């Protein structure tokens, strides 16, 4: 019997228990369960409250700068040959990535719940910057947990968070990356339940977070549908997005899931290759387990201990994935592939030189997959990729690898 039966619509999940097939759910400490249930109740109310939607739409337009443009990459298309390549330019949002879409939605929920303190975890620092930004905008204190390794390799974003008034707390346990930062944030939350709102940055964690984050990020895919119809008169043949925790990808994919003609490719961090442990390709090389409140694909050993992975990209350096992606993989609706560090670096440089756009290392992974696929497709076919972050934060990492002293 299939544990993940094919539904009438790929867009109907999660169920009332927060499950996508066998994935998702709500695995949290007893102390947190009342708060999680309060959050779910507030989220259910907010979803049907016209004033909530109106305030979020206003902020998206006048604060974030939405809609973000749909851009035809003419020179890159000519360089690669084959399919026409479009970018959804979410790196042009206020704060430089898609993360602000989610943070604005969640800060409005925190306000509705009367919370007076914001905590967040961050890897690349983009979610940390977006969290610090919305906390400043609404006058709330913000503490950001960040792995010590990431503090070092994402120095520009650490400075931005501090400028915005947030306290950045480095986490040195484990490998000092995103998983460890999330562990510390959860510990803080358990200790300070009453006044604290935990602003999770990706489409993972206990229900209702995966659903909430997806809904706030779906503005990407909804805009893309309208813009693509206006530009080409039809939907794209293929969507491509990077997946770390998976929020930018699910935001692009979800509004297209019931369109059979649209193929979808999620691109994981292949790191230094899948042979050893120096990668973060949990869907390609992992197995189902429970981490950070939800059941999903994880990088784990035979005893169920979580492995410390690797990626050149701090935002993809996470040993799990949002549960909806796990479900979409198992039912075969979305294809997930790994891209190695070296391939992402090559893509980073190609886009910079052909289009004058410096991408973050996260979407550079998606671009590397586009570079493989576009030449094999017809000139009448269309690829739409989510350019989910800009590369200012990565210039020190890339400069060091390329031998360009900064």
Curated annotation (Swiss-Prot):
Q: Enzyme class, one word? A: lyase
The source's superkingdom equals Bacteria
Annotated CDD domains: Trp-synth_B (cd06446)
Cofactor field: pyridoxal 5'-phosphate
Write out the pathway annotation from the protein's UniProt entry: Amino-acid biosynthesis; L-tryptophan biosynthesis; L-tryptophan from chorismate: step 5/5
What are the entry keywords? Amino-acid biosynthesis, Aromatic amino acid biosynthesis, Lyase, Pyridoxal phosphate, Tryptophan biosynthesis
Q: Which residues carry this modification: N6-(pyridoxal phosphate)lysine?
A: 99
Give its E.C. classification number.
4.2.1.20
What reaction gets catalysed by this protein? (1S,2R)-1-C-(indol-3-yl)glycerol 3-phosphate + L-serine = D-glyceraldehyde 3-phosphate + L-tryptophan + H2O
Quaternary state and interactors: Tetramer of two alpha and two beta chains.
Indicate what this protein is called per its UniProt record.
Tryptophan synthase beta chain
């Amino acid at each position: 019997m299939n544990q993940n039966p094919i539904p009438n619509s790929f867009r109907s999940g999660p169920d009332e228990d927060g499950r996508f097939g066998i994935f998702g759910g709500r695995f949290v400490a007893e102390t947190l369960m009342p708060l999680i249930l309060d959050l779910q109740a507030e989220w259910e109310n907010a979803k049907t409250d016209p004033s909530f939607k109106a305030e979020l739409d206003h902020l998206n337009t006048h604060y974030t700068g939405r809609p973000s443009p749909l851009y035809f990459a003419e020179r890159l298309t000519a360089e690669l040959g084959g399919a026409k390549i479009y970018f959804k330019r979410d790196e042009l949002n206020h704060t430089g990535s898609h993360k602000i879409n989610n943070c604005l939605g969640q800060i409005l929920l925190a306000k509705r719940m009367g919370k007076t303190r914001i905590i967040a975890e961050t890897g690349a620092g983009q979610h940390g910057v977006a969290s610090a930004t919305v906390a400043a905008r609404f006058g709330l204190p913000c503490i950001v947990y960040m792995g010590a390794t990431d503090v070092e390799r994402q120095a520009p974003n650490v400075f931005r968070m501090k400028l915005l008034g947030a306290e950045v707390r480095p986490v040195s346990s484990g490998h000092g990356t995103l998983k460890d930062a999330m562990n510390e944030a959860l510990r803080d939350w358990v200790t300070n339940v009453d006044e604290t709102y935990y602003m999770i940055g990706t489409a993972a964690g206990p229900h209702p977070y995966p659903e909430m984050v997806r809904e706030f990020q779906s503005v990407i895919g909804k805009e893309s549908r309208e813009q693509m119809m206006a530009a080409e008169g039809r939907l794209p043949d293929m969507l491509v997005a990077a997946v770390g925790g998976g929020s930018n990808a699910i935001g692009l994919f979800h509004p297209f899931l019931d369109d059979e003609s649209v193929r979808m490719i999620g691109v994981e961090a292949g790191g230094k290759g899948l042979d050893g442990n120096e990668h973060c390709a949990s869907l390609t090389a992992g197995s189902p387990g429970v981490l950070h409140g939800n059941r999903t694909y994880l990088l784990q050993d035979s005893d169920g201990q979580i492995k410390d992975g690797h990626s050149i990209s701090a935002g993809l350096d996470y040993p799990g994935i949002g549960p909806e992606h796990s479900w979409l993989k198992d039912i075969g609706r979305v294809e997930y592939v790994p891209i190695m560090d070296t391939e992402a670096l090559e893509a980073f440089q190609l886009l910079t030189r052909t289009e004058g756009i410096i991408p973050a290392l996260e979407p550079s992974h998606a671009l590397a997959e586009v570079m493989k696929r576009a030449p094999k497709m017809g000139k009448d076919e269309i690829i739409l990729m989510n350019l989910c972050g800009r590369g200012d934060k990565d210039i020190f990492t890339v400069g060091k690898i390329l031998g360009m002293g900064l």
